[in-house]
Amino acid sequence: ERSQFLHQVLSRVARDFRRCATSDTTVLGTSEKNTNLSARVNEVMTEFADDTRANMRNFLDDETQAELKEGAKEALGHNLANFMHGDLFRDIFASNTTPVLTGNSETALAQTRARVGECLVALVSHHAGSSGVTRELHAALLEFINDVLDTAVLNTRFLVQRLVKAETVVTFTTNHYYSQTIAKFDQIVRDNANGWRHNHHAHYDGVDDGEDEGLSRDFMHSVAHDFHIGSNEASAIRQMQVSLHAYSKVVQKRFVDTVSVLVLNELVYAIADKLSDDALLWATLLLDKVKEDESVDRERKKLGADQQRLQQALRLLGKF
């Protein structure tokens, strides 16, 4: 009976957790927000995306230009002034991107673990209770669940760290945004270069044409000014800045989407599978946690003693 009771409790928790993960808002009533797990995790991932976008380095700023200029200068004598240096590109990108990707993904992972934990606490409290005969079961089951979640977090963190390393070591994309942004920049330069070179009034045409690609007016004004001065080195630096800008947007979107899918799978759907798959095993391990309330135990023993005395009396009466 105890084993059957435990299996029923665990099966109900597993069933309802999967409902929570798939946008069922009626699991414990519409007023219980912790069990609206898909919505809670979506909030975490939306914040993760917003924070990553806000925290990424603006590679079109003057500081980046200065770093690139200094790095390119050190390579002169072997590379030409208009040459885009791959190692310099990767070094500046990685040093500015790694802390953002690492910190924001760790926050998203911790917050998702918290939301999943809150959902499971609500379900366990509902199905197993937290007093009387199920008091120890409630505590032991939550301990099991916390161990499973902690292990899942460790495994997921390892996978996310591998992703961070890949994004900061490997420079690769087939995303059209990267080539589209660079093509737009080149088009603006081609269309306006002649006017920029001969402009003596510091008012340049075309500097607003790249705003849809994130190429700000201030940046394009600086590009136009460089053409007026006539520096090949400056043009190469600006080209590299645009490449860094476009590639950072690609990585930001790619990383956020990949981490979000990974965390959802490992901390939500994989946990739902584990709860279902391990219900029988956990029921066996938790058998000793289902105990009677002390008052119930005393009453049961008293009734048993009374029953024994009654049976003894009946046997004595049967002798007459």
Regions found by a protein language model. Give the residues of each.
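Extended, charged coiled-coil "stalk/tether" helices of large eukaryotic trafficking and scaffold proteins
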Residues: 1-320
